[in-house]
Amino acid sequence: MIAVAVLTGSLCGAAFADTNRIDQIRPDAPELAAHGDLPIGVRTLSVVNPGQIDILKVEEGQDLPRYDRPLTPEVWYPAADGTGAGGTYEGVQLRDGVTTVQLTGLAVRDAAPAAPAAPYPLLIISHGYPGNRFLMSHLGENLATKGYVVVSIDHTESTYDNRAAFGSTLVNRPLDQLFVLNAIDGMSKESGHFLSGLVDVSDTGIIGYSMGGYGAVIVAGGGVTQASTEYSWRAPAGTLQMHLAGSESHEALIDPRVKAAVAIGPWGMNTGFWDEDGMKGVRKPMLFIAGSDDDISGYENGVKALFEASVSTDRYLLTFHYANHNASAPMSAPAESWQPSEHLDFIPFDHYADAVWDTVRMNNITQYFITAFFGQYLKGDDELGTYLDLVEHSRDALHALEEDGTPKPEHNYWKGFPARTAKGLSLSRKGAGE
């Protein structure tokens, strides 16, 4: 639930006003990190995907058991003119799957939707293993204020309180992403539904973190290897074969409504789930985001290798140098996560934070690049696309302005970044065929 709150002062900068804010924008944040002008609402949905393989009950040599698979999406959306700002999310679980906390943000629960002249693009957010629909809530709110309907999924058998066999995540993650796309499509066509006239599912982007990024790569066209379907710890009874590169079943997943994808620390390349041949199938523009020291998904043999191998599409690789697997995606560690939990053998804080980078700074930089990327590839905004046309290594960029603020001829600093703030970053880019 989210309860309407009255906030005073700056909504973006008053990190001290409430605990566990998901809407913080640092004073040194790059230009596009700022929230948009639209008020936003939030609602929780429940959907069920019927007749899915029950991975947890599969037995070798037996018929595949089926079940109706429930999912819980959180939806952020532009709200009607005059909607206020501010609310709290109650009962949000931490990494231990037991402790619940309150988050504070901008969205108003069950606010009346906007009545736009044209519907907004759809963005689908997909968490890691484990995670939940609030892990990237900072992105959900931020992007909704900029004219997107954003849907973040609680993936059954992959959340903090019901994490189950990894095989379920391997098989179901891309299926969940596309089922939610279809579910939102259906709702948008229902007369009187709050999504009717609000969202255009033919213009969809996917944002996936870790195993969510794994799913996004598969949906974008990257089929898995035969070897990955045969690992001893694989999805059972050949069930991962449906995502095999070159198979009819995988090709059927490639949905023309999905126009682009962001994969943050996508897991799988470093463990042999993809190879260069399979990655040639990726045909959606991609923004890969990674920490150079990611010891879960890998960097040189992981996310960077995915970027290099996606030769059939335009793609970018944003690197947070010296960051680990938590680069970019998770919200700031809630205050309660700083304390040990008897249910974990590590402090929950470690699930959210990075040892080198400040989380809010990473969130703000990520908001900047995702705003530019989807602005270009979903909204066709060429001006936003210029924010991706950067000197590859920020250390090589020169900030040189005249006294009146106009750029000197040698000025090539990262667009939208204040002086001295584009540190520790690189943005690589390659076009289709490169």
Predicted regions and their residues:
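Domain-level recognition of soluble alpha/beta enzyme cores
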Residues: 18-123
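Alpha/beta-hydrolase-fold serine-hydrolase catalytic core, especially in secreted/extracellular enzymes
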Residues: 19-27, 57, 313, 322-325, ...
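Active-site machinery of serine-nucleophile hydrolases
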Residues: 73-82, 134-161, 167, 174-175, ...
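Short substrate-entry loop that stabilizes the transition state in hydrolases
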Residues: 109-120, 125-162, 270-271, 295-299
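Alpha/beta-hydrolase active-site loop
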Residues: 167-201, 217-218, 228-247
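Gly/Ala-rich beta-loop-alpha elbow adjacent to hydrolase catalytic centers
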Residues: 208, 212, 216
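Short alpha-helix in the alpha/beta-hydrolase fold that links the catalytic acid
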Residues: 275-276, 297-308
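Short beta-strand/loop motif that positions the catalytic acidic residue
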Residues: 282, 288-290
